Structure formats: structure tokens, C-alpha cells
């Protein structure tokens, strides 16, 4: 994946989330949302590897969405079209992706993948997500580093990755609290959330989800054996 100073560098940790969703949902008839998409690595990987029917990727940063669009084009798509309306098509089967970008209509990027689709949407969390739109799965790798810790991070992270994508507020849990509440409004009954977490946040995030009404909470470890993803189901 291409990256710049506007997005996080994709890490092996995030593969844990992608691999688990692919394992849990082999069926293609799935509506999925990736909140805080950044470079688009999660959403694009799930759209292509999972072949899912409908994937939406959301980020507050217009610059980040430009990177995600670039990745969609560079990794999977060949470009056709005019200055006002671009279309993209995957050059290899079986995906046959045709992606149309409506440049004159704001930040929404609509990709048509035959019966599947990929959408990039600029939004401050769920603000621009229509209230009646529901999903089967919502995934997120939100900012989760406590504010006071950021200045002590490795220079390659602190100085070259956007603070917007790192800073999880005072205790690092701000976005999990918001997501736990907002995701429940957009999940179909029985739908699941998958949140990437810091290695020491599993208990706190699990508690947040429990209080918000989620059930079947599971902590998933990454390859080195560290807590990396929390999965939970919404049954209301």
C-alpha cells in the first residue's frame, strides 16, 4: 500500500483483524463498514480478498481518502474516463471492478464491483453516514494511543505519522467509547464489530462494549501472541 504523511503506515498487527473477518464471513453477501480507514488497507483488502457485496470506508481526513483512492487505483484498478468523471476497472479476473469517481460531487467515491461495491466517504465518524444505513460488520483501527504517550513514541512514528490518526485522547479509549455507541445504531441484529486495540487495552475495551450492550465479546491475539483485536456481537 502507498502511504504518505497523512496516514498511518500499515502494520502486520492489522492483518489479524482482516484475517479474522475473512475467516468468520466466507459468504459474499455482506455489508461492511471500515471506520477510520486511513490508507484504505483494511477496506480494500476486505473488498478484494473477501469479495464482499458492499464495503464502505470512512475517514475524517480528505487527504487520507486521497491516499485510499490512490491505493484502490494502484493496487487493483486501471483508469478510464474524463476529468469530471473517472471510472476504474480491475485488469484481472475474477473481481471485474468498475469504479466511478464523481469528482464534481464532493468527497464520496463510489466503486461499482458488479454486484459488489466499494465506497470512500469523508465523515467525522458517523456524522455523514445516513441514519437508516445498516451494516453486518463494522471494523475500525481508531486512534488509541494516550495523548501523553505520543511524544515518547519512536521518532519514525511520532514525526512522520499524523497525530490525528494516533491520538486516542487522555486514556486512549475515547474513540472506543464513541464507536461502541454509534456502531450499535448501524448494526443489523447479530452484526459484529472488530476493533484493533493496543496490546494492553483488551480489558478496558471489552468493558466498554459490555456496558454498551454488546455480547459474545472475544479478544483475538496477533501473531506474536499479544491482544490485538476485540470482537463483539450486537443482538438487539
Located regions from the model:
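Conserved SAM/SAH cofactor-binding pocket of Class I
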Residues: 16-84, 93-95, 99-102, 106-109, ...
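Class I S-adenosylmethionine-dependent transferase superfamily signal
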Residues: 21, 46, 157, 179-183
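Conserved Class I SAM-dependent methyltransferase catalytic core
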Residues: 2, 170-233
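Pre-signature/interface helix of ABC/ABC-like ATPase nucleotide-binding domains
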Residues: 1, 33, 118, 155, ...
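Residue-level signal for the nucleotide or nucleotide-sugar donor/cofactor binding architecture
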Residues: 8-12, 63, 67, 140, ...
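C-terminal beta-strand of the catalytic ATP-binding
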Residues: 144, 233-236
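Mobile active-site "lid"/loop adjacent to the S-adenosyl-L-methionine
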Residues: 144-174
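Conserved AdoMet
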Residues: 1-23
